A protein has these predicted regions:
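C-terminal segment of classical bacterial N-terminal signal peptides
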Residues: 16-24
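Short non-domain terminal segments
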Residues: 3-4, 15-16, 32, 229
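Bacterial N-terminal signal peptides that target proteins for export
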Residues: 1-10
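Transmembrane beta-barrel domains of Gram-negative outer membranes and organellar outer membranes
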Residues: 25-303
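Short N-terminal leader segment in a subset of presequences, especially plant chloroplast
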Residues: 9-11, 33-34
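Short coil/turn motifs at helix boundaries and re-entrant loops, enriched in small/polar
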Residues: 14-17, 269
Length: 303
């Protein structure tokens, strides 16, 4: 995702060392299909859209509860480089207080596919996400400062394990590492810390099991299901917030078709700072590059 001559030189060097990222279809590394996970980011660039994602968050320590409904769009600029944009409409209910609604801040991002290694079912990308200042409603807590978040996303399938471990080969692991850098150290009387974000997803692909390991006779809709558990944690590390890690664990399942997928997960807080009780999220997600390969799903440039 570099924006100058260095990007061209870096991409050329990677192309000489690694298998071509552009040669693979949406979310594939060899025989491995990586679905678009709900909580953590995908390790591949693509033209795709989540329309919508609906999230009922666990109850917070002050008794408030938030419902988020939001679209998210990703478009390929080149076969290895994309741009993302999204936001959430938020509905927050607090005990003894009026309900507040409004849009959260605008989020954009850009990602560059570092490599896709088909024989080892591995891929990774580097990106930069931005949460923009003054682009949402203050009533729902949209920030008045911009946050820059460089990120690394990766995925690894276990299909290259030996044949003596057949039932482990459908497993895959994806993950994210990122840092948040707010452009203001303080706003509205509150300090804004830097934050280390880390998350991963453990997946077990029924399509991979039946197509690449052993057909166990599952028919529709189970033959396209991918059970998974996602984990995401955020750890501030300065400005008085050290030791206040929050996060969620989200077990669920994704049904992945040729042109779209449907996913649902429970939301379980990791500690009292993250809330209490159980939440949930559902998502309808479209593969635009497969739906419209000669239209809006096509990269703007083939460079």
């Amino acid at each position: 995702m570099q924006r100058d001559i260095c990007r061209g030189l870096g991409a050329a060097a990677l192309a000489a060392l690694l298998p071509s990222a552009a040669a693979e279809a949406h979310g594939f590394a060899g025989d491995r299909f990586f679905p678009a996970t709900i909580l953590t980011d995908d390790p591949f660039v693509a033209s795709e859209a989540s329309l919508p994602t609906v999230t009922l968050n666990p109850t917070q320590s002050d008794g408030s509860r938030e419902l988020d409904i939001g679209p998210d769009l990703s478009m390929l600029i080149t076969p290895n480089w994309d741009f993302t944009i999204g936001s959430d409409w938020q509905h927050i209910r607090s005990p003894g207080m009026p309900t507040v609604t409004g849009w959260g801040g605008l989020n954009t991002g850009t990602q560059y596919q570092l490599f896709i290694n088909a024989p080892h079912e591995a891929m990774a990308l580097a990106g930069l996400n931005v949460n923009w200042a003054n682009t949402g409603s203050q009533a729902v807590g949209a920030p008045d400062f911009t946050t820059l978040s460089p990120t690394i996303d990766f995925g690894k399938g276990f299909g290259d394990l030996p044949d003596s471990l057949p039932w482990l080969r459908p497993f895959a692991l994806t993950g994210n590492l990122s840092f948040d850098f707010p452009t203001k150290t303080q706003s509205m009387g509150m300090l804004n810390p830097n934050v280390f974000n880390y998350g991963f997803a453990i997946e077990y692909s029924i399509p991979y099991l039946q197509g690449e390991v052993r057909d166990i006779g599952l028919g529709p809709p189970f033959n396209r299901m991918i059970p998974l558990v996602e984990f995401a944690l955020s750890s501030p590390f300065n400005r008085g917030f050290s030791g206040t890690t929050t996060g969620t664990v989200q077990p669920g399942v994704i049904w992945a078709g040729p042109y779209f997928q449907v996913g649902a997960e429970m939301i379980i807080p990791t500690n009292s700072l993250s809330g209490h009780g159980i939440g949930g999220v559902v998502q309808l997600h479209f593969y635009l590059d497969d739906l419209f390969p000669n239209g809006i799903g096509r990269p703007i440039s083939q460079w």
